[in-house]
């Protein structure tokens, strides 16, 4: 006769309880992560707009005018060329990361083009230009005033 008292293990109920806890934790993590990612992208775009505002102010101090702009769709290209010219002898006001650019366009954290207008049409904290991202949904119905838009006049 052999005795079974020396064997140890988990009961079926203990295993099911652990699996249940793991499923609950996984469900919580999967619902929280997308919100954290969007918040991180919003903060990254706000930081980029802040860096651009500093560079624009430095440009203004040197030239006594804000960078020129074309149409709403080309304004950001003019801004990029003014702040980070391709001419190596010209003064650069900002350095961009590769993922912040697509050609001469400056991108937000969602890969959408930023918008720059001079003169600005909003009551801007900077006074003379509008700078904004269309935000997570990628659309701006009222010139940068959508609820999720990130701009320089309401920060």
Give the residues covered by each predicted segment.
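N-terminal single-pass transmembrane signal-anchor helix
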Residues: 2, 6-36
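Short, surface-exposed interaction loops/tails
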Residues: 3, 38, 42-43, 50-61, ...
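Generic leucine side-chain signal with a strong bias for well-ordered alpha-helical environments
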Residues: 12-16, 49-52, 83
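Short, glycine/small-hydrophobic-rich surface segments
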Residues: 56-104, 123
């Amino acid at each position: 006769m052999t005795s079974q008292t020396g064997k140890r293990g988990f009961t079926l109920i203990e295993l099911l309880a652990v699996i249940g806890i793991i499923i609950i934790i996984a469900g919580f993590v999967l619902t929280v992560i997308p919100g954290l990612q969007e918040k991180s992208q919003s903060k990254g775009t706000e930081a980029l707009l802040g860096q651009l505002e500093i560079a624009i102010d430095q440009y203004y101090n040197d030239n006594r005018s804000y960078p020129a702009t074309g149409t709403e769709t080309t304004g950001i290209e003019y801004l990029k060329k003014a702040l980070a010219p391709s001419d190596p002898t010209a003064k650069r006001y900002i350095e961009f990361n590769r993922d912040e650019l697509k050609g001469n366009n400056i991108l937000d954290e969602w890969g959408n083009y930023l918008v720059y207008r001079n003169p600005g049409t909003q009551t801007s904290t900077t006074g003379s230009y509008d700078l904004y991202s269309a935000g997570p949904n990628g659309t701006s119905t009222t010139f940068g005033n959508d609820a999720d838009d990130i701009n320089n006049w309401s920060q």
